[in-house]
């Protein structure tokens, strides 16, 4: 496809006053299309089916799902209806904590100031705040990258870019900042089975911005890192426990183990809203199990014989001991520093 129909800046979630417009990420890179979301149930379906995906992006989408829910509410008892909408949205994706953070924030506002205008402003603030947050993550991440070589080769897993956020991205925010500072030689993007977010989405974003990218089969990461072709690994996150254990797309932990073995720094880039200080470790992070059809076939073409069984967790947990640094909008922290910094941020 050409990029003539694509905005210069990728915005996966947009609000037009009474409906929400999403980039349909299930059909990229071959087709670029948007879908208009008119109801809260449609938004829940879009999140569950990964039309919109990525922890920050589904938080933003859920916030506007709550605005849509308010529009649907019967007169006289909108809060009860909104609580039902919140429950439906919460049930869509269990691992990404940004979803719950955004819904709780919207409910708090609705109970304090129950009006459409106030909810719309809050959802818009979540969207705009996420873009600013991602840009800050990008700048902090740039400073955390190795000083040498001057032009870096970075490896990433899955898609933690503009498509996974309100715009700019977390891990790809670091990539974009490095590119703009002329410190980026190349990105290696793991294809990220089974849904191929690296091959389909990360590569699409980077080609769109003319950033050099090489797609790898997931099984190639050890070979490429071991041959000295990678200077640092930067990934996103769907939930980070207080001790720095990080849930991210399945396969991330394996990349972290490889990076540690070969002495390559491994960074996690995510907003503070992804950090769950209520969980002491990654053992408490719920791991979403997805449909076996994602592994059985690609675009209807069977990959395995009939009769086999599938195990399809969407995420794994990378132990904090394998993480060099966690890049958030306020700076870069060693995993052991995260909880204290989070408590200070909350004023506790």
From Swiss-Prot:
<feature type="binding site">
    <location>
        <begin position="248"/>
        <end position="249"/>
    </location>
    <ligand>
        <name>substrate</name>
    </ligand>
</feature>
<dbReference type="InterPro" id="IPR011559">
    <property type="entry name" value="Initiation_fac_2B_a/b/d"/>
</dbReference>
<comment type="pathway">
    <text>Amino-acid biosynthesis; L-methionine biosynthesis via salvage pathway; L-methionine from S-methyl-5-thio-alpha-D-ribose 1-phosphate: step 1/6.</text>
</comment>
<comment type="function">
    <text>Catalyzes the interconversion of methylthioribose-1-phosphate (MTR-1-P) into methylthioribulose-1-phosphate (MTRu-1-P).</text>
</comment>
<keyword id="KW-0486">Methionine biosynthesis</keyword>
<feature type="active site" description="Proton donor">
    <location>
        <position position="238"/>
    </location>
</feature>
<feature type="binding site">
    <location>
        <begin position="53"/>
        <end position="55"/>
    </location>
    <ligand>
        <name>substrate</name>
    </ligand>
</feature>
<keyword id="KW-0028">Amino-acid biosynthesis</keyword>
<feature type="binding site">
    <location>
        <position position="93"/>
    </location>
    <ligand>
        <name>substrate</name>
    </ligand>
</feature>
<dbReference type="Pfam" id="PF01008">
    <property type="entry name" value="IF-2B"/>
</dbReference>
<feature type="binding site">
    <location>
        <position position="197"/>
    </location>
    <ligand>
        <name>substrate</name>
    </ligand>
</feature>
<protein>
    <recommendedName>
        <fullName>Methylthioribose-1-phosphate isomerase</fullName>
        <ecNumber>5.3.1.23</ecNumber>
    </recommendedName>
</protein>
<comment type="similarity">
    <text>Belongs to the eIF-2B alpha/beta/delta subunits family. MtnA subfamily.</text>
</comment>
<dbReference type="InterPro" id="IPR005251">
    <property type="entry name" value="IF-M1Pi"/>
</dbReference>
<dbReference type="InterPro" id="IPR027363">
    <property type="entry name" value="M1Pi_N"/>
</dbReference>
<keyword id="KW-0413">Isomerase</keyword>
<dbReference type="GO" id="GO:0046523">
    <property type="term" value="F:S-methyl-5-thioribose-1-phosphate isomerase activity"/>
</dbReference>
<dbReference type="GO" id="GO:0019509">
    <property type="term" value="P:L-methionine salvage from methylthioadenosine"/>
</dbReference>
<dbReference type="InterPro" id="IPR042529">
    <property type="entry name" value="IF_2B-like_C"/>
</dbReference>
<feature type="site" description="Transition state stabilizer">
    <location>
        <position position="158"/>
    </location>
</feature>
<dbReference type="InterPro" id="IPR000649">
    <property type="entry name" value="IF-2B-related"/>
</dbReference>
<dbReference type="InterPro" id="IPR037171">
    <property type="entry name" value="NagB/RpiA_transferase-like"/>
</dbReference>
